Amino acid sequence: GINYEDRSEPFLGASGVTHPLLSEAVTQFQAQSYKEMLPSGGPVKTQVLGAPTQETEAQAQRVEDFMNYQITEIMEEYDPDTDQMLFYLPLTGSTFKKIYFDETKQRAVSKFVPAEDMVVPYSASDLRTAERVTHVVRMSYNDIRKLQIAGVYRDVELSETNDGEDEGAIKERSDELLGLRPNYSDDSYTLLECHIDLDLEGFEDKDMEGNSSGIMLPYIVTLDQSSGKVLSISRNFREQDPL
């Protein structure tokens, strides 16, 4: 129903009427989307392109069965992360999925990335053609240390944790709508994972004569936001990929 409360902000006598319409709409959207995107048999459906044969149909079925097994049984975070993403989507308008190979788990993982944690240039129209894509990653010291021991990140000393920094108006508003309120410090670090094109000395693109072409190549550069220290630079392309 409609609730009413006396308010003095932003001015005396301001309307204090509230109604859970947005919460109801979000819940309905989440429930309907979850049913469509995560059916009981698994989210993957395969289709044979071209004239189907018994062999290609059997191959497609094997791919479908394996992918659904991978997502529903092995990737334990896929279901709850997707469920959470579908709750955020109607509130923020955009959400992202990040699927990558996790060195500590030694398997593919699927992570929900809120819109406020994905930073692109203002002129970008999509992620594929954006000159730079930065994922704001919040990670505990223990998880960072695991990656340092595994050789993924440089073994360098990090600055003090920066979990108390402002996370932005979008995050604050979405937490307010969800009824969330942080009541403790999780001592997390903020890392910036930048997907960017670089022309690194000693790793230049070569032309047919073996000379540097001057073409920048895609890399992933991860750094600690607080100290500015680079933790890793990794190649984001295969040798056979087109320029």
Predicted regions and their residues:
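Extended, helix-rich architectural segments
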Residues: 1-242
